[in-house]
């Protein structure tokens, strides 16, 4: 009896965890009602993994939707495992892999519609022995480049539940954490379901950024080539040192009101795609020497998140994000800070810098941009609410991330433009003089500003509409 209870309790824990992942995927519309699948290795029985049933509704999983399957291939239970169970089984045999997720993220799938004759987002690698085209997607943003790196994209004669998928996808995921089936969607593997979700979320963020950059007239192929030729450690000015998701993160804060304040912002940023899950950061200054810091700015509902007290003075092992928070608190009167991957705002910042200073600013880091009070780049809103609240948003190039001195122009941008600065190719840094709410408002506003600008730009180019500049505040 006790043994049966342990087995039942273990299966229930697995179900709740997979249910949480499925709900998180549905929140960002990464699947239709019944598409995609996810699996997880049984942490107790090494011969068993669990997978969502064929035809199950990923955003509303019930216990019967989680099907246990032996690695030997014999399954049991009331429901039938996903049609891609064999693919999951082979991927889960890779050392260190405990979970696989396949989802139909819109932007991650959209970038896959390239051909060997025309590439908008991908680098053509060649064809295999069966003349199937193979490509590589390389993120051009700092977070994507370091979190996931290059992602292989394969074309398939039958891209759903086929024997060629069973053969090639596990092979691709033996070499990388992600792969994309052209026209179908990405697969991710992870040491946990949470980590697999993190990789998919970052891929979607980087894909969205790449699409908006391309639609703004920026040749991302040149940027991708430069990154791959130089290597990311030479191309980018800093290493963000992004770590894996900790399934049981450390939380030092017990105050329910503080926890709820952070949770609301984290959940909102994830749902609205203002940040990729597990990236970014947010904090609140509680004294001249201390702050409460969260090493994420986007987390799905019902997920745990890290929260700790830390000193405002620099420490040797500080991450890039943490150093930025400390730099801001040391040199401004701001009392809250949020860093969000913000794909649209980050892309718009890159496009504006390229338009004003040439493509070199995105390629070689040799272009020097002035950051004088009377001469510096900005992003100008065109929508009424943003113009009323903040008629300019600060903008800097990514090289400023290497400067941790009081002369960093990010600080002046936050002073001059009501606590909002876009770091092109990295993130939006938003702050508040009093509450975390103010920083959250700035982050959300920056993403909407970029969306309006991009859509009007597309209307101008495709529909002969008025130019963006017509609506910019004078």
Identify the residue ranges that each predicted region occupies.
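Glycine-rich flexible loops
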Residues: 1-474
């Amino acid at each position: 009896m006790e043994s049966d209870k342990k087995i039942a309790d273990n299966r229930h824990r697995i179900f709740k965890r997979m249910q949480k992942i499925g709900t998180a995927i549905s929140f960002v519309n990464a699947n239709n009602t019944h598409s995609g699948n996810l699996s997880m290795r049984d942490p107790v029985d090494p011969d068993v993994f669990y997978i969502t049933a064929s035809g199950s509704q990923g955003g509303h999983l019930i216990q019967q939707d989680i099907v246990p399957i032996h690695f030997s291939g014999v399954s049991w239970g009331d429901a039938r495992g996903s049609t891609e169970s064999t693919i999951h089984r082979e991927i889960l045999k890779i050392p260190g892999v405990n979970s696989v997720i396949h989802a139909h993220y819109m932007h991650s799938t959209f970038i896959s519609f390239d051909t060997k004759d025309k590439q908008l987002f991908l680098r053509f690698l060649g064809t295999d022995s069966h003349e199937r085209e193979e490509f590589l997607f390389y993120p051009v943003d700092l977070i994507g480049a370091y979190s996931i790196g290059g992602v292989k994209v394969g074309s398939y004669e039958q891209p759903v539940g086929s024997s060629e998928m069973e053969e090639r996808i596990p092979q691709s995921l033996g070499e990388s954490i992600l792969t994309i089936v052209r026209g179908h969607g990405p697969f991710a593997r992870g040491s946990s379901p949470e980590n697999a979700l993190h990789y998919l979320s970052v891929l979607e963020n980087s894909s969205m950024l790449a699409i908006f950059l391309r639609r703004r007239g920026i040749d991302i192929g040149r940027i991708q080539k430069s990154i791959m030729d130089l290597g990311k450690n030479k191309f980018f000015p800093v290493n963000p040192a992004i770590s894996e998701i900790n399934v049981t993160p450390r939380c030092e804060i017990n105050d329910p009101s503080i926890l709820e304040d952070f949770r609301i912002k984290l959940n909102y940023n994830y749902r609205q795609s203002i940040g990729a899950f597990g990236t970014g950061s947010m904090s609140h200054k509680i004294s001249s020497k201390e702050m409460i810091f969260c090493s994420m700015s986007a987390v799905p509902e019902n997920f745990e998140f890290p929260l700790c007290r830390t000193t405002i003075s620099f420490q040797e092992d500080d991450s890039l994000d943490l150093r930025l928070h400390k730099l801001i608190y040391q040199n401004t009167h701001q009392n809250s800070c949020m860093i969000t991957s913000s794909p649209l705002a980050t892309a718009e910042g890159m496009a504006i810098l390229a338009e004003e200073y040439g493509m070199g600013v995105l390629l070689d880091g040799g272009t020097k941009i002035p950051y004088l009070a009377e001469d510096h780049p900005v992003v100008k809103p065109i929508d009424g609410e943003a113009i009323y609240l903040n008629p300019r948003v600060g903008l800097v190039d990514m090289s400023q991330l290497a400067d941790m001195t009081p002369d960093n122009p990010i600080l002046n941008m936050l002073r001059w433009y009501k606590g909002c600065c876009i770091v092109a190719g990295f993130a939006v840094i938003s702050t508040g003089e009093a509450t975390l709410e103010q920083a959250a408002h700035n982050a959300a506003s920056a993403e909407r500003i970029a969306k309006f600008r991009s859509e009007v730009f597309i209307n101008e180019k495709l529909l002969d509409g008025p130019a963006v500049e017509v609506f910019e505040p004078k």
